Amino acid sequence: MLYNLLLPHIHNSHIANLFHYITFRSGLAIIITLSLSFITGPILIEFLRSIQKNGQPIRSDGPESHQTKVGTPTMGGIMIILSSCLSTLLLADLTNKYIWITLFGFISFGIIGFMDDYAKVTKNNHYGVRGKSKLLLQGIISVIICVLLEYLDKSPSHLLNVPFFKNLSLDLGYCYIVFAIFVIVGSSNAVNLTDGLDGLATVPIAFTAGSFALISYLVGNLIYSNYLQLTYIPNTGELTVLCAGLVGSCLGFLWFNAQPAEVFMGDTGSLSLGGVLGIISVITKHEIVLAIVGGLFVIETASVILQVYYFKATKGKRIFKMAPLHHHFEKHGWAESKVVIRFWIISVIFALIGLSSLKLR
């Protein structure tokens, strides 16, 4: 909004001219979301605590140390969604179609997560909304997003770019739409599975959002995209502002979510954040890079899939002591803080590998 209001005065005012630069608005987005989180965090946490008598239900079959988390409120993802959306509406170009499509998906996935968290809190169990119902709703939202992208793009690309290889891309035709839906839904649920310890998912999400802030900026810049031999996609640069807002809001949330957590982001946060990262990867045509940068999410998801299929195939045997993988290490005796920090280190490594694909090809 500020960008659109100041746009006519860019050449007449030095301050207005600053808003012409995506980098300036992105930095400002981080500052705004951090500030909003610090200011509204205590108020929101106290409100959630007052309306949630027992907080987020804790699994009885989980690590014993988790019983100390009883009474911790959930739905903290509301803080992330509100601060990110507000900074985006203030600083991004509101005539940009990608901004509105991404915000639509972000909020929609947040609503699905809120419904799940609400069901858990009111029923006082950790099951919430049925898995198939959530998948159906996620699928519907993803279909709408993909149809919008297909309809609004004058010449939509169905190419899947392969990182680390020069000029290597796969033409999926209209099957690309199915693939894009899979990416968005898969990303949403992968982040959700990772969010099982205090602060565990928050930092990797921030790393991934930061990586895609850079990717969005490069892909939306004709000079940089040509130099790096990336597919140039006009107007994606504005997503840098949104991604920067995600980074700031996640760091602000971490202030309250660090062990021992004062609040959990819940499915409200994890489903929305995973979904928005998937949407941005589809828009920027860096779906495979998302799987690399967010490699920790992939590993956590794979551990659950392997555990379920192995359990069924062997009629009761398990590969891991508990899935997702972070619980396996807890069952092995690792302290929660050690699991979290080591997984953060892994996510940094994956982010660096993913970003290196922009140049190494």
From Swiss-Prot:
Record-linked PROSITE patterns: MRAY_1, MRAY_2
GO biological process, one term: regulation of cell shape
Catalysed reactions, semicolon-separated: UDP-N-acetyl-alpha-D-muramoyl-L-alanyl-gamma-D-glutamyl-meso-2,6-diaminopimeloyl-D-alanyl-D-alanine + di-trans,octa-cis-undecaprenyl phosphate = di-trans,octa-cis-undecaprenyl diphospho-N-acetyl-alpha-D-muramoyl-L-alanyl-D-glutamyl-meso-2,6-diaminopimeloyl-D-alanyl-D-alanine + UMP
Membrane topology designation: Multi-pass membrane protein
Domain of life: Bacteria
Annotated transmembrane regions: 28-48, 74-94, 99-119, 133-153, 168-188, 203-223, 236-256, 263-283, 288-308, 338-358
Keyword terms of this UniProt record: Cell cycle, Cell division, Cell inner membrane, Cell membrane, Cell shape, Cell wall biogenesis/degradation, Magnesium, Membrane, Metal-binding, Peptidoglycan synthesis, Transferase, Transmembrane, Transmembrane helix
Annotated metabolic or biological route of this protein: Cell wall biogenesis; peptidoglycan biosynthesis
Cofactor(s) the protein needs: Mg(2+)
Keyword Mitochondrion included in the entry's annotation: no
GO CC annotation, single: plasma membrane
Molecular-function annotations in GO: metal ion binding; phospho-N-acetylmuramoyl-pentapeptide-transferase activity; UDP-N-acetylmuramoyl-L-alanyl-D-glutamyl-meso-2,6-diaminopimelyl-D-alanyl-D-alanine:undecaprenyl-phosphate transferase activity
Annotated family: Belongs to the glycosyltransferase 4 family. MraY subfamily.
General function of this protein: Catalyzes the initial step of the lipid cycle reactions in the biosynthesis of the cell wall peptidoglycan: transfers peptidoglycan precursor phospho-MurNAc-pentapeptide from UDP-MurNAc-pentapeptide onto the lipid carrier undecaprenyl phosphate, yielding undecaprenyl-pyrophosphoryl-MurNAc-pentapeptide, known as lipid I.
Protein name per the record: Phospho-N-acetylmuramoyl-pentapeptide-transferase
Organism this protein belongs to: Rickettsia rickettsii (strain Sheila Smith)
Gene assigned in the entry: mraY
